[in-house]
Design a protein with these regions (language model features):
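Glycine-rich FAD pyrophosphate-binding loop
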Residues: 83-101
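N-terminal Rossmann-like FAD-binding beta1-loop-alpha1 element of flavoenzymes
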Residues: 63-88
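Short glycine/serine/threonine-rich phosphate/pyrophosphate-binding segments
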Residues: 71-79, 99, 186, 197-203
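Feature captures the FAD/FMN-dependent oxidoreductase FAD-binding
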Residues: 30, 35, 40-44, 58, ...
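Short internal alpha-helix immediately C-terminal to a glycine-rich phosphate-binding loop
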Residues: 51-56, 61, 198-206
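Non-catalytic propeptide/linker segments at domain boundaries
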Residues: 13-51
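Glycine-rich phosphate-binding loops of nucleotide-dependent enzymes
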Residues: 106
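Single conserved hydrophobic/aromatic residue that forms the stacking wall/gate
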Residues: 1-12
Length: 206
């Protein structure tokens, strides 16, 4: 009936409903609930074929590794670059700027996006600064060693033959600066996990 259908929809539309619903009795999770949910969701199968893509690895050295190309990361890289330090600026996005690209406020009398573009242009003109877009810092280890994964071919529909799809860089940095930004704090209220309910930052961005 419509009433029952609506009630069922309210339950099953909720994000992660199965983690909140199938909690009792505890012994049922492994033997009953989980197998049913896994079968309903479907599991992928390995093809068994060789990976056709090419992957590479390399080494880089710098005085300062800046992780994140938002307003803080751009400012830090620019300051260090102007001072003559060897700088590497990595960001997982294809375009530097971070939240500046989505916010309405400006910086220094210009829009955030224009300010970011101006800073990037100056960084590109400095021979001692290297920009690494589409790159993710995935690990930090002893002695200033950082692992950075650069996606060099994922965004290209038909990459050149022999060009690596990804490069794993071992970056030796005297200092590193984490400028990964912040996550908007979630405000808890009833049914806040239903589809269509977004935080203010997501509304401004999308």
């Amino acid at each position: 009936t419509p009433g029952h259908s609506s009630a069922a929809s309210d339950v099953y539309k909720r994000q992660g409903f199965y983690y909140k619903t199938f909690m009792w009795p505890k012994a049922f999770w492994e033997r009953v609930y989980e197998p049913i949910i896994r079968r309903a969701a479907g599991l992928g199968a390995l093809s068994g074929e060789d990976d056709p893509d090419v992957y590479d690895r390399g080494f880089r050295h710098c005085d300062l590794l800046v992780i994140g190309a938002g307003p803080a990361g751009l400012s830090a890289a620019l300051t260090a670059g102007r001072a003559g330090a060897e700088v590497i600026l990595v960001d997982e996005d294809f375009r530097a700027g971070g939240r500046l690209l989505q916010e309405s406020f400006g910086v220094g009398g210009v829009s955030g996006a224009d300010w970011a573009a101006t800073v990037v242009a100056e960084l590109q003109s400095l021979p001692n600064v290297r920009l690494m877009p589409r790159s993710t810092a995935i690990g930090v280890f002893d002695h200033g060693i950082h692992a950075v994964l650069e996606r060099t071919g994922d965004h290209i529909a038909a990459p050149d033959a022999g060009k690596p799809r990804q490069i794993l860089w071992r970056v030796y940095a005297r200092r590193s600066l984490l400028c990964a930004g912040a996550t908007e704090r979630l405000i808890g209220f009833a049914d806040n996990d239903r589809p269509g309910i977004m935080q203010a930052g997501a509304v401004r961005g999308y």
